């Protein structure tokens, strides 16, 4: 993983988990706004780090925990997670012993949809996408 930080290390900490297809720097505009009051931590998953290999979700969580410890973070005021990052954040939240003040999920995919339901929904999803195409997005 790669970690970027903004703000004062002694300020309350905010941890961001990024969405799929982007890096931790995608949260930088928000972190820049918060950096005067918070220590913002923006990890980038090993999937997006050149020369690193993704091992597992548990390994990603371990790396986040180790980094927080190395920075002296003893409490997280806020954890922010978007899309697939919410899945990693949930794994982090269920295993960490750090106290957490608040959590904000944006578009987390937590639904457990069975194979039968997925098979049944596929034709409808196909038609929905096709109808958007036919209507030219309107």
Predicted regions and their residues:
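Conserved HGGG/HGGXW glycine-rich cap/lid loop of the alpha/beta-hydrolase fold
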Residues: 4-50
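Active-site loop/oxyanion-hole signature of alpha/beta-hydrolase fold enzymes
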Residues: 41-78
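Flexible "cap/lid" loop of the alpha/beta hydrolase fold
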Residues: 94, 100-131
């Amino acid at each position: 993983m790669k970690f970027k930080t903004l703000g004062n290390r002694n300020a309350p900490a905010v941890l961001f988990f990024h969405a799929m297809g982007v890096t931790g720097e995608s949260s930088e505009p928000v972190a820049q706004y918060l950096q005067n009051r918070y220590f913002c931590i923006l990890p980038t998953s090993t999937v997006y780090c050149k020369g690193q290999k993704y091992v597992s979700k548990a390994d990603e969580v371990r790396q986040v925990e180790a980094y927080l410890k190395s920075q002296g973070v003893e409490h997280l005021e806020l954890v922010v997670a978007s899309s697939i990052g919410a899945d990693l954040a949930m794994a982090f939240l269920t295993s960490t012993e750090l106290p957490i003040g608040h959590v904000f999920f944006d578009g987390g995919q937590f639904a457990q949809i069975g194979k039968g339901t997925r098979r049944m929904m596929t034709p409808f999803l196909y038609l929905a996408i096709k109808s958007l195409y036919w209507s030219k997005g309107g």
